[in-house]
Regions:
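Phosphopantetheine-dependent thiolation modules in NRPS/PKS and related acyl-activating systems
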Residues: 1-36, 44-46, 51-80
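Two-component histidine kinase catalytic core, primarily the HATPase_c
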Residues: 40
Length: 80
């Protein structure tokens, strides 16, 4: 399973099924398109840390705007 697929699963889990895979396009804005808020983002990051065995910089991740940026950022942590 790719990083993108795992991140999409995490987002769907956090949004409790209110989003579908069809909505999770790489260019999707996390806030306006996917309707995430800061609490959702925090939960996603905690689950990403557990799933990928990484430690993320919350401040850096708050600057991420799209799904593609989030996936790229997580990949950076995984290879660091």
């Amino acid at each position: 399973m790719t990083t993108n697929e795992k991140v999409c699963e995490i987002i769907i889990k956090v949004k409790k099924g209110k989003l579908t895979l069809d909505q999770l396009k790489p260019e999707a804005d996390l806030y306006s398109d996917l309707d995430l808020d800061s609490l959702d983002l925090s939960e996603i990051l905690v689950l990403a840390e557990e799933t990928f065995n990484i430690s993320v910089d919350i401040g850096k991740e708050q600057q991420v705007k799209t799904l593609a940026e989030m996936v790229a950022s997580i990949d950076e942590y995984r290879t660091a």
